[in-house]
Amino acid sequence: IVLMGTNDFNAGIPIGEWFTETEEQVLAARGEMKKMETCKKRTPVMDSNTYKGRINIGITRMKQLFPDKQIILLTPLHRAFANFGETNVQPDENYQNSCGEYVDAYVQAVKEAGNLWGLPVIDFNSVTDFNSVTGMNPMIEEQLIYFYDSGFDRLHPNTKGQERMARTLMYQLLALPV
C-alpha cells in the first residue's frame, strides 16, 4: 500500500510527464503484408526530479522486487493549514505550491498511475467534491475531530482519523484480489 503525494506537493516537485516519445522503425502488418513502419514509441520517464517520474521509478522497482504482490495506490488526503515552526508553515489546499500546482494535480497523477500501471487506487481525496472514501476533510471545521490539532496541524490525522482510515482501507482491500 503506497500513500504518496502530499510531501511532493509541499516540496513543489514539478508534476512532469509520464512518457517520452521517439520515432522508431518497427515491423507491422495491419491488414496488409508485413513491413517496416515508422511509429511513435513511448517510454516511461524515470526522472526523480518530477512527480510522475518518481512514481514510474517507484512502481517499476516495486514490481521488480515484489512481482507476486498486489500494489495499491492511495491518493493524498485533503490538506489544511499546518504550522510546524518558523521554517515549515504549509498553507491549505486552496493555495498553489511553489511550482504553481494545486494538490489536485498530485491526486490526479496517482489516479492516472493506477490506470497506466494496472494498479488499484483507493481515493482518499476526491478532486470533484468532498466525497472521498474516508469522508475526512480538514477544510471543513466539523471534520477537525479527525485531525491532530486545529490550531497548528490540520494536515495529519489523529488517532480517531487514523482509525477511520484503517477501517476504510480494510473494507476497500476486501474487494481486491490477494
Across the structure, where does each feature detected by a protein language model lie?
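Alpha-helical cap/lid subdomain in secreted, periplasmic
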Residues: I1-P177
